[in-house]
Amino acid sequence: EIGATTSTFGYDDSMRRYLAATGRQDVVNAADKVASYLTADSEVYANPEKYFDQLIEINLSELEPHINGPFTPDRGTPVSKMKAEAEANGWPIKVEWGLIGSCTNSSYEDMSRAASIVRQAVAHGITPKAEFGINPGSEQIRYTIERDGIIADFEKMGTKVFTNACGPCIGQWDREGADKQEKNTIVHSFNRNFSKRADGNPNTHAFVTSPEMVAALAISGRLDFNPI
């Protein structure tokens, strides 16, 4: 959504284990025969700056959660600076809705991480200040998160479970009051947040962030809430 057209991941042990664990041993067997052609040469890994136009190294232990938006996914703000940024730009601080799912950030792992935040809130008797909804990424995801009690965790907090579809990400959301076109803020884990996309309201300030952050912001009901 911010300009990349292609991304590649070299074949390695992690990919091999994943393919085997998901019933694709035949793919593993075929890939193992040409494994050296499915990843970069050793010289590239040793000196990547010699082979690429730009090398970006990210230390995950130092990475701060970001909230992107509104109206574009390439405007990122660290959570520690969101309060000042929102005040400077007149963005509505109150979060009306938190949405997780669609095709992006709706895997079993995504849902389970968000549910861990929800469980902590429920255990402490905290109720969400914003409306909260999830779209499972597929029927398999819906089935497994229901089987493992994750949907029940969400429902204990009053979360609305939508169908396994694109949902609000492509405007399949009959949001009550959207026709009034009032200025408001929503946060979601969808990868697109362009004007009018979710609910048809050009004044809806949609922000993109991780499933965990969506859960935290929906519970707090504030865009400037910093959970870290």
Q: What does each of the following model-derived ranges do?
A:
Residues 1-228:
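Fe-S-dependent hydro-lyases/dehydratases of central metabolism
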